């Protein structure tokens, strides 16, 4: 499918040609943006369709562009919040490791906005989790901890409100 062809960080020329052929066989484009969004692929799909020179129906192109702009903005806000959280943890002498999208967006993707993120995941030592919760609660625009899903793994969901966006932070 088109989404399968677009589900790659980079698209070499041969892959772009395959993507273009696949796109050429699509009769109904209406559901493509919502499917791409559902699978976290809207920004990558737009990037690869453009690179392949695919003639995308105008309404679909607009939807993909809007989704891409939204993800770019959200990732910028989340990245800024992540930098603040990591700086606060470092200042407190707490070692941490960024997991999942927060790391992958910056390590694998040519532009972080190509990797949609829903939250930030940070790993800390079990015995420092309570201190992390206190640090996060003291940050500007902090939101109270929502819940600890599993006390054995100290999985804590909390967050910050930044630039009109809720930045969910999961401490593992």
Outline where the language-model segments fall.
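Conserved NTP-donor binding/palm subdomain of two-metal-ion nucleotidyltransferases/polymerases, i.e.
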Residues: 1-118, 124-172
């Amino acid at each position: 499918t088109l989404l399968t062809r677009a589900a790659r960080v980079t698209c070499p020329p041969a892959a772009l040609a395959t993507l273009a052929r696949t796109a050429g066989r699509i009769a109904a484009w209406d559901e493509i943006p919502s499917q791409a969004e559902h699978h976290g692929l809207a920004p990558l799909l737009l990037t690869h369709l453009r690179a392949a020179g695919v003639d995308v129906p105008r309404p679909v192109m607009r939807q993909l562009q809007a989704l891409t702009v939204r993800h770019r903005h959200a990732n910028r806000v989340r990245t800024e919040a992540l930098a603040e959280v990591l700086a606060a943890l470092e200042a407190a002498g707490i070692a941490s490791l960024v997991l999942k999208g927060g790391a992958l967006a910056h390590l694998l993707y040519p532009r972080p906005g190509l990797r949609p993120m829903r939250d930030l995941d940070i790993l800390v030592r079990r015995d420092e989790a309570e201190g992390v919760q206190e640090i996060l609660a003291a940050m500007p625009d902090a939101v109270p901890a929502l819940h600890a899903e599993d006390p054995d793994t100290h999985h804590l969901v909390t967050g910050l409100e930044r630039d009109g966006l809720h930045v969910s932070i999961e401490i593992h």
